Amino acid sequence: MDEGVIAVSAMDAFEKLEKVGEGTYGKVYRAREKATGKIVALKKTRLHEDEEGVPSTTLREISILRMLARDPHVVRLMDVKQGLSKEGKTVLYLVFEYMDTDVKKFIRSFRSTGKNIPTQTIKSLMYQLCKGMAFCHGHGILHRDLKPHNLLMDPKTMRLKIADLGLARAFTLPMKKYTHEILTLWYRAPEVLLGATHYSTAVDMWSVGCIFAELVTNQAIFQGDSELQQLLHIFKLFGTPNEEMWPGVSTLKNWHEYPQWKPSTLSSAVPNLDEAGVDLLSKMLQYEPAKRISAKMAMEHPYFDDLPEKSSL
């Protein structure tokens, strides 16, 4: 058992208030810590009978979160507790700090009123996202499932934190082959859609670009309902890729002959974004993964030059 797992029944320590979500590996509850009255998020992970001890996915998540907990833009894992379900099965509770809302709900609140998110708010959220991802990537961690729903935020302070690192995996060079049970389609990088088995931090940067565009327009930029449809949405905006635009693309496993589209201008998809913003977005949404801007370089981009409180974010 991981040394940090405390064998105290979680239900003695916490009062469940409501179910707030269903993660990849288990349910998430808003709960109150009885001793302090503090509100926390409890992520409940079931341990299957056929597994010896704690699932490797959970142990991986715990070790990653412990390592990343130092960063202000990664949701903090406060504790890990063991408990028993009604059926007497062992369950593990990951205790996280609780955040009131997430970027998906935040965008929806603007969309429902027909208003745009203020430019400086978008800048601040994007800077924090790039900063958090630069920290993860700097520690050899890919998120692989970035989307507005797992970017938690405090609406009072506009502090953003990256959550749900359940699918995160430490990457070391050379890149390992990965399974692709990852990512919600809308934020999925084209190399993943095309069946690449070697990928890098660039998959997260594509997702960051999609989130950026969505903050600007209140709508997801590519809304495919299948892997093929998702690719076609991307091709319609950026043109159907070829070997000249993206060397090696035609060797990817899922590559076929696709309809030929000519590129449109990116600014037409994000009409309210200024020139510097469009430039940064275009660097995030490059076809060729090696050409995509890194999170660290994105933080240095002129788009963020007029953000006053960078050092305090």
UniProtKB/Swiss-Prot annotation:
What gene is it encoded by? CDKB2-1
GO annotation, biological process: G2/M transition of mitotic cell cycle; hormone-mediated signaling pathway; regulation of G2/M transition of mitotic cell cycle; regulation of meristem structural organization
UniProt record similarity statement: Belongs to the protein kinase superfamily. CMGC Ser/Thr protein kinase family. CDC2/CDKX subfamily.
| EC numbers on record | 2.7.11.22, 2.7.11.23
What are its GO cellular component terms?
Answer: cyclin-dependent protein kinase holoenzyme complex
Q: What is this protein called?
A: Cyclin-dependent kinase B2-1
* Subunit comment: Interacts with CYCD4-1 and CKS1.
Active site per database record: D145 (proton acceptor)
Q: Which UniProt keywords apply?
A: Acetylation, ATP-binding, Kinase, Nucleotide-binding, Phosphoprotein, Serine/threonine-protein kinase, Transferase
Keyword Transmembrane helix found: no
Q: What is this organism's lineage?
A: Eukaryota, Viridiplantae, Streptophyta, Embryophyta, Tracheophyta
Miscellaneous note, as given in the UniProt record, is: Protein abundance may be regulated through proteasome-mediated protein degradation.
Positions modified as Phosphotyrosine?
Y25
| One Pfam family it belongs to | Pkinase
